[in-house]
Amino acid sequence: MDTRVTIITGPIGSGKSTALKYIKEKGFATTDLDSISNNILESQSSFEFLEANFSECLVQNKIDKKLLAEVVFTNQDKLNNLENYLHPLVTLQVATLIQQTTNHLFIEASAPKNIHQLYPTVVIFAEEPIRRKRLQSRGMSITDIDNRITTQPKESWWKSLGIVIENTSYTELHAQIEKLLDLSYE
């Protein structure tokens, strides 16, 4: 297990991005798998896959991420197809990034698949009512929130992945991250 890398994960709306932003502000290297995935999907090399499998999500030959989300979060087969396409490509880019990194790297993974087996993992967690409220404040519809939460694993699975940080407030999240960084990475 490569201890130069830590995975930051958790269910939607739990505060992964907030945690990663705070870690970055503390001077650590960070990246997130969603950005890597989006870059892959927007690349010309993905066009053939998208045209064959998600043509309804192409607008002027470019992927419409909102349409894609509507499709994959209401159709498990489509979600699996997209994940099976992206997973090896993302894994390759992450491996390259890790090779180029000399210091500790924190990687946000919203859908961790098997990456949590390769690196120490920190789960940012918040109870579902809190997550729903956060997602609504971002402008997500109740239907979209329901669709996304339904496709995600249950609480027990998330909490089995590694160290759990309960995110009840910004102050508490920052305090727990500080403690983690002090214990592990300095």
Where are the predicted features?
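Hydrophobic anchor at the beta1->P-loop junction of P-loop NTPases
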Residues: 8
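ATP-binding Walker
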Residues: 14
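Small-molecule kinase domains that catalyze NTP-dependent phosphoryl transfer to phosphate-bearing small molecules
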Residues: 94, 137-186
